[in-house]
Amino acid sequence: MGYRIEMATRNPFDIDHKSKYLREAALEANLSHPETTPTMLTCPIDSGFLKDPVITPEGFVYNKSSILKWLETKKEDPQSRKPLTAKDLQPFPELLIIVNRFVETQTNYEKLKNRLVQNARVAARQKEYTEIPDIFLCPISKTLIKTPVITAQGKVYDQEALSNFLIATGNKDETGKKLSIDDVVVFDELYQQIKVYNFYRKREMQKNQIQPSVSSGFGFFSLNFLTSWLWGTEEKKEKTSSDMTY
């Protein structure tokens, strides 16, 4: 009898209900790349980060302002479609610790990424193209990156080189830390700068190849012409001298 009373009066927002969501949200945040958005940290209604999270008796989480606006016209949960009222919502401020931490990680990542792009712009338009700039070199293959990918920590690799390396090492990077190909995303901004670098480098190489050949050809032509002219002049002189002697 006591067991039934306990179940009947059990608070739907008990600690186990919230703690489960917190554990799963923290795990997803830790495994998510800063360029992605963890679903458990966003509101299913407005798709934005949770700023004023509330939790329903079934364990669904929303931004308070968004769910209240929803309930003005619909008296049901957007996901389960079961009856729901404003009184059923429970504040969930504990989740903000995870949300704010991930947002901070995203901000720091974007700053690092922007610095990389700025450095790449400078490197792509350098005056000399004798050596490949370090920012365009893959730390694994030591060659020019073809398809750049970036980790959550801002480390850049060539996609194919990294994929082959991780297969060989059992998903460990060159320092021995765990890393899988799913932990990286394509770095399109850097790819665009590599294209610019390749364009200028190719143009510079063609320029250096054409100029010596044109110069050498002109020099060879001039030398032959001068030699022929001098030789012809000498022959003419000898003939004239011979005629006069005769």
Swiss-Prot record:
Superkingdom classification of source: Bacteria
Xref: CDD domains: RING-Ubox (cd16453), RING-Ubox_LubX-like_rpt1 (cd23149)
Keywords tagged on the record: Repeat, Secreted, Transferase, Ubl conjugation, Ubl conjugation pathway, Virulence
EC number, UniProt record: 2.3.2.27
GO cellular component: cytoplasm; extracellular region; host cell
Induction: Induced upon infection.
GO biological process terms on file: cellular response to misfolded protein; positive regulation of proteolysis; proteasome-mediated ubiquitin-dependent protein catabolic process; protein polyubiquitination; protein quality control for misfolded or incompletely synthesized proteins; protein ubiquitination
Gene Ontology molecular function terms on file: protein-folding chaperone binding; ubiquitin protein ligase activity; ubiquitin-protein transferase activity
Post-translational modification: Ubiquitinated in the presence of host E1 ubiquitin-activating enzyme, E2 ubiquitin-conjugating enzyme (UBE2D1 or UBE2D3) and ubiquitin.
Coiled-coil ranges from the UniProt annotation: none
Stored InterPro entries: Ubox_domain, Znf_RING/FYVE/PHD
Catalytic activity entry: S-ubiquitinyl-[E2 ubiquitin-conjugating enzyme]-L-cysteine + [acceptor protein]-L-lysine = [E2 ubiquitin-conjugating enzyme]-L-cysteine + N(6)-ubiquitinyl-[acceptor protein]-L-lysine
Subcellular location: Secreted; Host cell
Short name of one Pfam family: U-box
First-tier enzyme category under EC: transferase
Protein purpose: Effector proteins function to alter host cell physiology and promote bacterial survival in host tissues. This protein is an E3 ubiquitin ligase that interferes with host's ubiquitination pathway. Acts in conjunction with host E2 ubiquitin-conjugating enzymes UBE2D1 (UBCH5A) or UBE2D3 (UBCH5C), and mediates polyubiquitination of host kinase CLK1.
Subunit structure: Interacts with host CLK1.
Entry comment, domain topic: U-box 1 is critical to the ubiquitin ligase activity, and U-box 2 mediates interaction with host CLK1.
PANTHER family, A to Z: E3 UBIQUITIN-PROTEIN LIGASE CHIP
Annotated protein name in UniProt: E3 ubiquitin-protein ligase LubX
Organism: Legionella pneumophila subsp. pneumophila (strain Philadelphia 1 / ATCC 33152 / DSM 7513)
